[in-house]
Amino acid sequence: YRPVWRETIELPLGDISVHFAPPTAAAGTVAAEIWAMMNDDKRYRDADPEERPHLFVEAATRAYADRAHWLNTDGTSSIKPFDLVASSRIAKMMSTYNSDTHTPIASYNPMPVEVVQDPAATTFVVMDRSGSAVSCALTMNGLFGSGIVTSDSGVLLASVPGSGGRGPLSLGPILATDHFTRDFFFAGAASGGVTAATSLISVIIKNLVDIEDLEK
């Protein structure tokens, strides 16, 4: 197994660049679409506080429904990752949005498809005193991996990626940096299966857009 370097899905927020993990870390792409829909044309900033939870749910529902359109069986995307968050595409996805009414699921095209996701994952964020940071998400492809411990080293072996959500489907760490200086602003990662993307976006939207105190 060798590491593979991939370009992130990068979205702007003023002078800040928010980096999302690309497929096969599908939760990163879902999070990127949610972020794009909420921030396109300053939609979230301009929304009344009472509308914002509704906007969040509508954007998340559209992102998960859209996943059925681009997600291949091996976790890759049938569409180039950055094209998934192109302004024209995001505008089309939000064209049916109504600030006062829930959009019926039956009207979605494509329709949402149930995808089994294994919540077995862990995440961590590390920052050093010079201001460098990493945001990581990893999985052993199942609770306790394969359940096999090597006799000589005591290492618990990971399971083989496969059906039942075993793999990087629910992974999606986020990193926000200054677009010009690359100074670090925010790093976050979440586990928990299907809820990872929405949990993380709900935090990052409050701390990068609402500028809410993290202690809250």
What are these regions, as identified by a protein language model?
Residues Y1-F56:
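Structured, charged N-terminal subsegments at the starts of enzyme catalytic cores
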Residues W5, D118-A121, L143, L169-L171:
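Short, small/polar residue-rich loop motifs at catalytic or cofactor-binding pockets
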Residues D40-T139, S153:
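Internal maturation/activation junctions in enzymes
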Residues S17-P23, R45-A47, V113, A187-S191, ...:
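Second-shell loop/turn segments in exported
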Residues M127-V203, D210, E215:
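Active-site rim segments in enzyme catalytic domains, especially the processed small/beta chain
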Residues A26-E33, E51-E58, S88, P119, ...:
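Generic recognition of stable, solvent-exposed alpha-helical segments in well-folded globular domains
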Residues Y1, E114-P119, R166-G167:
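Short loop/turn motifs at secondary-structure junctions and domain boundaries
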